[in-house]
Amino acid sequence: MATLIKTLAAANQSERVKLKIPRSVQETIPIRRIYTNGIWEVGRKHSRSWKLTDVNYIAASQETQKSIFKAYCGALNSLPTDATAKITIVNHRLNPAEFERRILLAYQDDWLDHYREEANRIMKGRAEQSNNLVQERFVTLSIPQRRIDESKAYFKRAEANLQKTFARLDSGIQPAMNYDRLRILHDFFRPGYERYFDYDDYRYMSRAKDFRNLICPDGICFKRNHFEFGNKFGRVLFLRTYASFVTDDLISDLTEYARDLILSIDMIPVPTDEAVKEVESIILGVETDITRWQQRQNSRNNFTAEVPRTMEQKRENSRGYMDDLTQNDQRMIFSLITLVHTADSLEQLDADTESLIAVGKEHLCDISSAKYQQEDGLNTALPYGLRRLHALHTLTTESCAVAIPFRAQELQDPGGLSYGINEVSKNPLICDRKRLVSPHAFYLGVSGSGKSMGMKSTIMNVVLGTDDDVIIVDAEREYGTLARAFGGEVVEISPHSTHHLNPLEIVFGFEDENPVAQKTELITSILEQQMANGAIKGSYKSIIDRCTANVYN
């Protein structure tokens, strides 16, 4: 056990800090110093965070889910063994005003406002299916405190490794700077004041302001089984025991609960050589116990006694663990799952706690409250990079990866247009196609699936929400009524209509090298389509050139 205790002791040593009774609410926040590059000094550690983009995991096919799970296992295997990792999922609900600002069309005091009112009513009806939840995901690495230039170089190498490994998951990695990290804490400690958050490194550092004044609550009080801050109540829960078999939707079920909450998964990777030595010592201990038991039975002349099932099971489990480490390319990982949720009243907090515990029971897992450790639990659950609770579980890579943090990718671009509802989260799909590398779009589906209706809805949103021009090539004559309703012009082109297209017309005023030559190429291509391939020879093309020039002259 010496090697493993040494590894775990090194991680615990960096968590130990001198006990200090806070004299202000600012001192309850364990951030000692922040640097402009996003590195924080917390306790006796340096931490750095990156923002993860979500992955469409829940609605994916089984083969795709297996591929994502395998890639996530590879990402966990690549975590550095000289650092601790924390994956954090932040749930926060949009207030109604912010929610409407994102999805509703702005009125412009013109004759189209009654259409905008109707469109907003439809979008509000769709939005009622949503719980207004927005999820953000972060990965935080923490290392024992060292010189800041050394920490900066370390996190730079770690960032390159994270970008490479999470790219295989189609999940992007973006550095979370001080603004992003402090915003998470501000929104948690000061709910209802999210829009007032305003932080700038230069402004605060040049004026020697304490950044904790910006994010701390008006007051905080830790009780036996909950804590109070501002006019809110909160409670920290942790996963006490795992089931023998855990499904990959445990984290998804916990985080889809329609409340403000933060869930964190702490991981301490163990070097493979130390893990193998530890498992070997466990196997040796089990074999020794079995040998001693058999010797006692032999001394009683009981030579046919079978080894007790408990001992045999310990032998099988330890050997299976060794096979995972040595043959299946897995790693030993100490893991801890914590969750902090808030409510407006203690009664509501208790009800929410019961619901979350019930979710754990559905997965045969025991979720408990961190009694008498609410402050330590809060500092563990929040993305500081600390781990003050010690309810660790020894897992393999695959067992740890079962707590996969991905659910469904959201699409909510500021200033975008509505394109429907997310199938998993039920949140509106808001997209600004102009920001994409290729803004083109297609509606694909079987007959009767709503392609035309979706296109008409998109056209309506473009007309009502932007100044863009809309040109429709309507071969099936479906969009005439829509165009007239929005003041558009319908041009009918057919052998019997009064409108005709003249492909040989030249519109003057455009800077073009030779418009006549372009018309010559057009006539030549038309004739080539009508005649056999290669029938137009060079002499014929010369005649076409001269005739076309004479027409325009």
What are the residue ranges of the model-derived segments?
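Glycine-rich nucleotide cofactor-binding entry segment
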Residues: 385-437
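Switch/coupling segment of Walker-type NTPase motor domains
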Residues: 56, 63, 88-99, 113-117, ...
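Structural beta-strand/beta-sheet cores of well-ordered domains, especially the beta-sheet scaffolds
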Residues: 46-48, 83-85, 135-137, 218-238, ...
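Conserved structured core elements
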Residues: 66, 133, 156, 333, ...
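Extended, folded cores of ATP/NTP-driven motor/assembly subunits in large transport
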Residues: 1-406
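Glycine-rich phosphate-binding loop of nucleotide-binding enzymes
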Residues: 40, 48, 55, 62-65, ...
